[in-house]
């Protein structure tokens, strides 16, 4: 059985501010498994597909401009309950509403510069994983401490 997977992306503000290591470590400490990671500057076409659900909203162009403005760290994480678990680690979309201890609660203050993106459900995760990664880019491996993380 394949464990649940989710797509996460550290946005250009998180990369530029040197937050990549801290953000990665939060997911590792939680016990989720990183199965794919790459750094890229997304093309406009990729960004427009990724944010396609917002195409008719007034902030769409700004969102696409921002996500294509610099490097992004695109990742796939795997584990039991990883989609909901990642959303809880990330915190509210609006950083000022995010709880202390969450990534956005601790590291962001503006909704337009909220450091990280995370898939909001299984269908979205599947779509985003397929959009950002080829299947050949995923690593299937078992951490040596796996028996100590889940029953």
Swiss-Prot record:
Supply the InterPro entries for this chain. NDK-like_dom, NDK-like_dom_sf, Nucleoside_diP_kinase, Nucleoside_diP_kinase_AS
One Pfam assignment = NDK
- State the species of origin: Prochlorococcus marinus (strain MIT 9211)
In Swiss-Prot or TrEMBL terms, this protein is called Nucleoside diphosphate kinase
Q: NCBIfam families under this entry?
A: PRK00668.1
What Gene Ontology cellular-component terms does the record carry?
cytoplasm
Superkingdom, taxonomy of origin: Bacteria
Q: Identify its protein family.
A: Belongs to the NDK family.
* Example GO molecular function: metal ion binding
Check the record and name the CDD domains matching this protein: NDPk_I (cd04413)
Q: Where in the cell is it found?
A: Cytoplasm
Gene encoding it? ndk
What EC number(s) does its UniProt record assign?
A: 2.7.4.6
Q: Which residues bind ATP per the record?
A: 11, 59, 87, 93, 104, 114
Free-text function comment from the UniProt entry:
Major role in the synthesis of nucleoside triphosphates other than ATP. The ATP gamma phosphate is transferred to the NDP beta phosphate via a ping-pong mechanism, using a phosphorylated active-site intermediate.
GO annotation (BP), single: GTP biosynthetic process
What is the required cofactor set for this protein? Mg(2+)
Keyword hit for S-adenosyl-L-methionine? no
What is the protein's quaternary organization?
A: Homotetramer.
PROSITE patterns documented for this protein:
NDPK, NDPK_LIKE
Q: Which UniProt keywords apply?
A: ATP-binding, Cytoplasm, Kinase, Magnesium, Metal-binding, Nucleotide metabolism, Nucleotide-binding, Phosphoprotein, Transferase
Q: Which reaction does it catalyse?
A: a 2'-deoxyribonucleoside 5'-diphosphate + ATP = a 2'-deoxyribonucleoside 5'-triphosphate + ADP; a ribonucleoside 5'-diphosphate + ATP = a ribonucleoside 5'-triphosphate + ADP
Catalytic site? 117
Q: What class of enzyme is it?
A: transferase
